[in-house]
């Protein structure tokens, strides 16, 4: 019974009711589901895709990268390289592989194999999935990967370690990507302020 055009006010009302339930996990996801449904409703009512409703340009395509390079028993460097080549053959213009589960030396061999398979012009992203437990371990590994020009290193530490991510960002030339589990503007404000 509320006006869906007031999605920002409705979000604030829902969020203010979460103080006793926690502002993480399923509570925030539920608010997000309602919020997305409201934006979808008003943009469809206007006869526009959401990006146009919000004033963005008309777009025909969205760039996508292939996320692969998972660790699998028996997977060789040659298998990894072949997998990367298949993604390029499928039309992807960038790829992402997992790192952090092996020693820095062994993971560097994986990064090298992926880079050599796709060449220097294809962006190669690395996803550590919070693999390193301290900044020094992350810096050691990332320092070894940098020879292969990664486009970014994703989630090198636990997501809550904002200062650790900031220290890594200041210490390496590879951009640090983080925030996939963060859910509110306040979370992202902390990340931005920490650089």
Tell me what each language-model feature is.
Residues 1-45:
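Metal- or metallocofactor-binding catalytic centers and their adjacent structured scaffolds
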Residues 39, 65-67, 71, 92, ...:
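Tryptophan-centric aromatic hotspots in well-structured domains and transmembrane helices
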Residues 62-81, 99-100, 128-134, 177:
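Active-site mouth loops of central-metabolism enzymes
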């Amino acid at each position: 019974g509320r006006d869906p055009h007031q999605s920002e006010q409705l979000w604030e009302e829902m969020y203010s009711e979460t103080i006793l339930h926690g502002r993480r996990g399923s509570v925030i996801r539920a608010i997000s589901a309602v919020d997305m449904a409201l934006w979808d409703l008003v943009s469809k009512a206007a006869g526009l895709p959401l990006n146009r409703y919000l004033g963005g340009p008309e777009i025909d395509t969205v760039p996508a990268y292939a996320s692969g390079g998972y660790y699998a028993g028996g997977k060789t460097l040659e298998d990894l390289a072949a997998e990367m080549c298949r993604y390029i053959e499928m039309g992807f213009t960038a790829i992402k592989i997992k790192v952090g589960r092996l020693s820095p030396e062994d993971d560097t061999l994986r990064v090298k194999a992926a880079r050599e398979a796709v060449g220097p012009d294809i962006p190669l992203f690395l996803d550590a999935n919070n693999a390193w437990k301290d900044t020094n371990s992350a810096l050691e590994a990332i320092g070894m990967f940098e020879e292969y020009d990664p486009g970014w290193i994703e989630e090198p530490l636990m997501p809550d370690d904002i200062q650790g991510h900031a220290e890594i960002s200041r210490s390496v030339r590879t951009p640090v990507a983080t925030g996939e589990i963060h859910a509110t503007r306040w979370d992202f404000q902390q990340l931005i302020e920490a650089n």
